[in-house]
Amino acid sequence: MDKPNTGAAHTQFVRRTAYRVLAGINDVAIVTPSAATALALLTHPRRGIRRDELLGRVGFILEMAGRKQAPLSNTLKNALKIRRQEVAVAMAEMDEAGTRHLSLSMGAGSPLARARGKAVVEVIDEVLSRFIQKKQIRRHRFEDDVVYTPVPDARINLDIYKNNIVHLFVKEAILAAAIRGNLEQGFADLDRVREEASFLSDILKYEFVYNPKLSFEEQFQRTMAIFIESGLLEARLDEDGRTQISVPVAAHETMLVCHRVLEPWLEGYWMLITTVDAHLSVPTTEKDLVKRVQRITERRYQEGDLTCAEAGSSVPLKNCVSYLVETKLLQRQGSRRDQTLSLGERSADDPAQLTELAQRLRRYFCV
């Protein structure tokens, strides 16, 4: 019997094939009311979100889904069809004002996002009622408004819904994080942003599926062009001829929301790397390491150091371990049954490698 092909070329072929399959799955993943609502709730930068803002955020998510040609569930399609006149009026209003191309930068506050949100209000209300019944969110009634807040212990349940459509925002989230993490006096150097977007794409490659037909540079250039055309970014040359980019005031909220998409992974990876750096003095099993990180993550969340309880989800933590093994910051030892983790050759020779990686990742936390 022939031995299985385990060479580097075969590994690359299998990885590319897997990416194509997963990309195809993402292309047909249906945007459901539950997924859109959970994404709107969990990417909101504050503790709770007002009802009208939530609906606008859902409308913005539906616009992004439309731009990506993502299929909508029948309930969403029917709701938008029934209220298509109101959506058409909002489009006409933005066309007349010459702001249609700025709908992304306007985010949840654009007339189009608000119209779409109102169009699906009954569907979203059903989802909110179900989340409340399951004790996943709380509703706070006030004289003139309603505020919804995710229940901390239930964020991980909402995260499952959210992750069904998070792929629609990944490239925007990575670019937004790379930009916001490198702004100095309101500007970021384009070459620096490109370098850091590449870093974020690489460290999170076990989490997300990137377009296998495009190189990183091609995807970066396309996303940059969309950001500039839609008013999310402005670009200018400095006195040395280097391109500097900035975020217009009107686009700050949308950029923050895009950035927030990555926050659970950023916090989770940071927690695992810092735990390895501080505590992995003797070999340990992956299971024990992940459990330890989860306990520390829960404590740090309760202390207010972290904003996402879902950062302690086991799957991303295990993916982070895989990344550290691949980059020789960790190594696996022993048989599969009795396998342990210990410092890899890079971190054993230079312990500062882990500290520097954690610090580099930490700068991309949302602030």
Residue ranges and their predicted role:
Residues 1-367:
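Membrane-interfacial terminal anchoring regions of lipid-handling membrane enzymes
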